[in-house]
Regions:
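N-terminal and secondary-structure boundary signal
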Residues: 2-341
């Protein structure tokens, strides 16, 4: 019974993704006419410096994107408000702000909806508040902001309404995903896209993990069922709705084994940045030693032409990928996570 359900789920997910891909992807010679995708990879002994240097390498692409938007929003990853290894470090945000300072004249919003508690606790615990002195920033709790209704699937492929941040979906926003390179217990890895797709799903203001919590959260609905039957399809669909315009992966200290909250540190000292979210996440997975084709949502997005995944067509500025690949230990449930294939 379990195997038959798995086959049905795989058929549904692959069929749906390929059907969408047929409508999105300009298959054929049009692909060959595009210029290679550029992204940056840096390595060094300073987290903020790594991020800043990576962004400087792709400054023309970032400037081009900023010129078309009114507001800049940095979305950190705070799956936990009280565990630094699981969250975007303030020094990563500092590197981004230092780069943006001469390019953006208005306040830059730092906006988050942590999984296990209120945003203000994360901002306090991780010392984000100090960034308000040298930079023009404003801190936003996405759970207190307007939302729009999006739809995800559950394990029976029925749609479920969810609250999704209106700020993240705002067409006038230049959205930056500032993520940590981590393994994951359901989606293999956490990188730039997952930070947006899961992080912009909202919860009630009083919600916390654990017994006695007040309110509800919509974040778990991205899993698509108790065995994560729809997680990759849901991530893929949200990638079409809210792709980041700029992705920054902070791998100065990554997380391996039982991420995204119970893993152990990896002294990697890298940063990746680019305006093609799929190319950045694909390179991030490569640096962590994972085959992106085994990561469902990245595979679906590649089939749909949502970005570049061919390393021969990705121009990496700065360091060479091959020089910095580390074999991150995967989550204990990794084989079960690969059952979508």
């Amino acid at each position: 019974m379990h195997a038959r359900q798995g086959m049905t789920r795989r058929g549904f997910l692959r069929g749906a993704a390929c059907g969408i891909a047929a409508g999105l992807m300009p298959w054929g010679t049009a692909r060959a006419e595009t210029a290679p995708t550029r992204l940056a990879l840096t390595h060094g002994n300073g987290r903020a410096a790594n991020v800043y240097d990576a962004l400087k390498l792709i400054e023309p692409q970032v400037r081009e994107g900023l010129a078309r938007k009114k507001t800049v929003v940095i979305k950190p990853n705070m799956v936990s408000v009280n565990q630094q290894l699981a969250a975007t470090h303030a020094e990563c945000i500092e590197g981004i702000l230092e780069f943006l300072s001469p390019l953006v004249k208005d306040d830059i919003l730092i906006a988050e909806s942590p999984a296990n508690g209120p945003a203000h606790e994360g901002y306090d615990n991780y010392d984000y508040r100090r960034l308000a002195k040298p930079y023009r920033v404003r801190f936003v709790d996405l759970d207190a902001e307007p939302f729009q209704t999006e739809y995800l699937v559950n394990e029976r492929h029925h749609v479920r309404p969810v609250r999704f941040s209106s700020l993240v979906l705002d067409p006038d926003v230049y959205l930056i995903s500032a993520a940590v390179m981590k393994t994951h217990d359901r989606a293999v890895v956490t990188l730039g896209l997952k930070n947006i797709a899961a992080g912009a799903l909202l919860k009630d203001g009083g919600f916390r993990w654990g017994a006695g919590s007040r309110g509800k959260t919509d974040k778990h609905l991205i899993h698509g069922g108790p065995e994560n039957q729809g997680i990759h399809y849901n991530m893929f669909m949200l990638a079409r709705r809210a792709p980041p315009h700029l992705t920054v992966l902070d791998g100065f200290e990554g997380m391996e084994h039982n991420g995204p909250t119970e893993g152990t540190p990896v002294d990697h000292r890298v940063a990746v940045a680019g305006t093609d979210w799929l190319a950045v996440d694909r390179v991030g997975a490569e640096l962590m030693g994972f085959d992106y084709r085994k990561i469902g949502y990245l595979s679906f997005a590649a089939d749909a032409g949502l970005g570049e995944t061919d390393l021969d067509r990705i121009e990496v500025l700065g360091e060479r990928i091959a020089d910095h690949v580390r074999a991150y230990r995967p989550h204990d449930t990794i084989e079960r996570q690969y059952l979508w294939m």
